[in-house]
From Swiss-Prot:
It comes from the Bacteria. InterPro entries: Ribosomal_uL11 (IPR000911), Ribosomal_uL11_bac-typ (IPR006519), Ribosomal_uL11_C (IPR020783), Ribosomal_uL11_C_sf (IPR036769), Ribosomal_uL11_CS (IPR020785), Ribosomal_uL11_N (IPR020784), Ribosomal_uL11_N_sf (IPR036796). The gene is rplK. GO terms for biological process: translation. It comes from Vibrio cholerae serotype O1 (strain ATCC 39315 / El Tor Inaba N16961). Forms part of the ribosomal stalk which helps the ribosome interact with GTP-bound translation factors. Keywords: Methylation, Ribonucleoprotein, Ribosomal protein, RNA-binding, rRNA-binding. Disulfide bonds: none annotated. Pfam families: Ribosomal_L11, Ribosomal_L11_N. One of its GO terms (cellular component) is cytosolic large ribosomal subunit. Belongs to the universal ribosomal protein uL11 family. This is Large ribosomal subunit protein uL11. The keyword rRNA-binding applies. Part of the ribosomal stalk of the 50S ribosomal subunit. Interacts with L10 and the large rRNA to form the base of the stalk. L10 forms an elongated spine to which L12 dimers bind in a sequential fashion forming a multimeric L10(L12)X complex. Coiled coil: none annotated.
Length: 142
């Protein structure tokens, strides 16, 4: 018989840098999960990614206090900031532009995000990511 799911915990954890401090410790501790076991497994799974890149993770906690987790791709805004070489988006995106991003870069980000964005073709994903870029104050070229 399948194990009974007790909770789903959604977090954003830096790749290769999971440790028992907040937000990981309190979120998993209150569910009775072995925090260090999660940290070691998460760090092992994300060691190939750029260290410090925020990775969304969904942790499924079962009634016997065991767990499984699924990592997602980094948020589009993080990938856009990295591609444009900026630290943060514009506070006034319609008037103050902070950088530019090319269509090729948007294509690359859409391909990266394709695993998480279900039910959309590549053109729809590109439009979505271009919209995110514009809302951050980036100029989309192409």
């Amino acid at each position: 018989m399948a194990k009974k799911v007790e909770a789903y915990v959604k977090l954003q954890v830096a790749a290769g840098m999971a440790n028992p401090s907040p937000p990981v410790g309190p979120a998993l501790g209150q569910r009775g999960v072995n925090i260090m076991e999660f940290c070691k497994a998460f760090n092992a799974r994300t060691e190939s990614l750029e260290k410090g890149l925020p990775i969304p993770v969904v942790i499924t906690v079962y009634s016997d206090r065991s767990f499984t987790f699924e990592t997602k791709t980094p948020p589009a805004s993080v990938l856009l900031k990295k591609a444009a070489g900026i630290k943060s988006g514009s506070a006034r995106p319609n008037t103050a532009k902070v950088g530019t991003i090319t269509d090729a870069q948007i294509q690359e980000i859409a391909a990266t995000k394709a695993a998480d964005m279900t039910g959309a073709d590549i053109e729809a994903m590109k439009r979505s990511i271009a919209g995110t870029a514009r809302s951050m104050g980036l100029v989309v070229e192409g």
